[in-house]
Amino acid sequence: MRILQRALTFEDVLMVPRKSSVLPKDVSLKSRLTKNIGLNIPFISAAMDTVTEHKTAIAMARLGGIGIVHKNMDIQTQVKEITKVKKSESGVINDPIFIHAHRTLADAKVITDNYKISGVPVVDDKGLLIGILTNRDVRFETDLSKKVGDVMTKMPLVTAHVGISLDEASDLMHKHKIEKLPIVDKDNVLKGLITIKDIQKRIEYPEANKDDFGRLRVGAAIGVGQLDRAEMLVKAGVDALVLDSAHGHSANILHTLEEIKKSLVVDVIVGNVVTKEATSDLISAGADAVKVGIGPGSICTTRIVAGVGMPQVSAIDNCVEVASKFDIPVIADGGIRYSGDVAKALALGASSVMIGSLLAGTEESPGDFMIYQGRQYKSYRGMGSIGAMTKGSSDRYFQEGVASEKLVPEGIEGRVPYRGKVSDMIFQLVGGVRSSMGYQGAKNILELYQNAEFVEITSAGLKESHVHGVDITKEAPNYYG
């Protein structure tokens, strides 16, 4: 029998406190998603069909993290999800949605409803700005067959030229009491749009994770051989692709990674793996970040069904040992129950954590609401569950094309307590990590990694760590028993 190592998970270890002059409120949580993309908080929402679509992704990016839109949908639908995130706000919208004057108000309503916007510039066939259609123009219109050109606010409009700063734009909009400022070139061709909503959001969400154009960052999951999907997502403006598999150390994954890096300019996160060798091979093939975790998720049964995996603390430690030599970030995916688990993962050298169950219960997640015994819940399922596999994730478990009755699941379907908004959950997780860094005397995540020392604890130590000898009469927002 070949026993390679003693393997530990989050509940097996604790960090030892250190002398500290660092206050939790003063620490920096800035980190990296990939070698080229930063994060303002080290949190990623999982690419699961009950966790991340555009609403979760928008919420995560506004808070400084990022969401990974799942792939259990056709290419066009996934592209639309990415577009909704990229269009949700922007410093300057460089490719604004527009409409032609001969279109109907019904057409305009489809556009505004689909992209959740309150108005749209109107252009002619040459792209020249000729008006703008806003809520004010259509508020009392009941005949949706009317032409946009008959209802819109016509030129002259208050406009600005390419290169205007957001501060200058804000002053101009305030002066003229307008909510939308079209950006035009010297020939009056529409080149961009600035909205007062985006300026307000910049103030409301100062830590938002944005790209070079002021748009929220977002990632998307793809499967083996899905180069067409990857290309369409990159065209839509996705910031990073997640090449997602239950077994990231496979020939097909390595081949797909090499093909993507050869043909597209985009950062690729690859996983899932748990060994040094796998990490080395993925980095050699071009991975911009490595995702770690086989079987730690609450809804994953891989370790039981297949007898394969590794406890998450040891898995992170293995992969970080190799990835750190190449300055490649490691993402700890799965097994996070408490904010203390996040702190442990970061102290082990992970650059960020990917979260599923804790976000599945939020308002923004795509799971279904349900009431059970008088309490609110939301549905949550593993991507290896029968339901998820029949919707498109079977390739993640190397069962693509298998009839539904022949699938061998590696996950279950269940429910999790409703936990309010994404911002409420992230607030508690961030607060816990800040507290941990204060105990460790770490001003930033790098110092946490450099400073942290661990002790292995017994089952009695774990029991002592949890609430004991008392009945909880009022639940805490960050402790689930």
Curated annotation (Swiss-Prot):
This is Inosine-5'-monophosphate dehydrogenase. Gene3D superfamilies: Aldolase class I. Mycophenolic acid (MPA) is a non-competitive inhibitor that prevents formation of the closed enzyme conformation by binding to the same site as the amobile flap. In contrast, mizoribine monophosphate (MZP) is a competitive inhibitor that induces the closed conformation. MPA is a potent inhibitor of mammalian IMPDHs but a poor inhibitor of the bacterial enzymes. MZP is a more potent inhibitor of bacterial IMPDH. Pathway: Purine metabolism; XMP biosynthesis via de novo pathway; XMP from IMP: step 1/1. It comes from the Bacteria. One of its GO terms (molecular function) is IMP dehydrogenase activity. It comes from Helicobacter pylori (strain J99 / ATCC 700824) (Campylobacter pylori J99). Signal peptide: none annotated. Keywords: CBS domain, GMP biosynthesis, Metal-binding, NAD, Oxidoreductase, Potassium, Purine biosynthesis, Repeat. Its cofactor is K(+). The lineage of its organism: Bacteria, Pseudomonadati, Campylobacterota, Epsilonproteobacteria, Campylobacterales. NAD(+) binds at residues 244, 293-295. It catalyses: IMP + NAD(+) + H2O = XMP + NADH + H(+). Catalyzes the conversion of inosine 5'-phosphate (IMP) to xanthosine 5'-phosphate (XMP), the first committed and rate-limiting step in the de novo synthesis of guanine nucleotides, and therefore plays an important role in the regulation of cell growth. One of its GO terms (biological process) is GMP biosynthetic process. K(+) binds at residues 295, 297, 300, 464-466.
